[in-house]
Amino acid sequence: MGQQSLIYSFVARGTVILAEYTEFKGNFTSVAAQCLQKLPSSNNKFTYNCDGHTFNYLADNGFTYCVVVIESAGRQIPMAFLERVKEDFNKRYGGGKASTAKANSLNKEFGSKLKEHMQYCADHPEEISKLSKVKAQVTEVKGVMMENIEKVLDRGEKIELLVDKTENLRSQAQDFRTQGTKMKRKLWFENMKIKLIVFGIIVALILIIILSVCHGFKCT
């Protein structure tokens, strides 16, 4: 999938961003901050669409985790990424200085961790997708509320999301489809392997029964 599919991420306490990371230039940071101001209190997971990108949020215990991704990356991987970041952040700062930290004061400590999580999720999309299905605490992605970002920001004009895109970024949609095809092929081979093993066991059992009844090959 490539790390370019994950554009920007941050951790905030309320509306105060404590740590953030991106390798791109654009207005997505200010758009994400504006969306943070408008998050509904009725749902702890929320996704906004804007100009081929999604702004994904996870709120938990007074903290909000956000990641901006290209739309072709889907919704499962960004939500799984946010769960990973939340778990890591809670282990490091649960009940600690994060509750009183100032804006961007955790950039040096946790900014690099955001980068690591972004890289890992980008490099292991199949593993992340499988884990997100298994974990009980991760609700199905289809349950995440969706809303047009223009409504959230109360603007009449269309928002043009500015992201400094590279050639690699423009090819991410094709990369994502390729990963899906490889995963389907791998699952098909695994399924066939299981069927062949079961078939072999059945044949072996039949031969054992025949040999035991016939005392070898001397059936009359």
UniProtKB/Swiss-Prot annotation:
InterPro entries: Longin-like_dom_sf (IPR011012), Longin_dom (IPR010908), Synaptobrevin-like (IPR001388), Synaptobrevin-like_transport (IPR051097), V_SNARE_CC (IPR042855)
CC per GO annotation: early endosome membrane; endosome; plasma membrane
Compartments (UniProt record): Cell membrane; Early endosome membrane
Segments forming domain v-SNARE coiled-coil homology: 130-190
Regions crossing the membrane: 197-217
Tissue expression notes: Expressed in flowers, leaves, stems and roots.
Keywords, alphabetical: Cell membrane, Coiled coil, Endosome, Membrane, Protein transport, Transmembrane, Transmembrane helix, Transport
Signal peptide range: none
Name assigned to this protein: Putative vesicle-associated membrane protein 726
Organism: Arabidopsis thaliana
Lineage: Eukaryota, Viridiplantae, Streptophyta, Embryophyta, Tracheophyta
Gene behind this protein: VAMP726
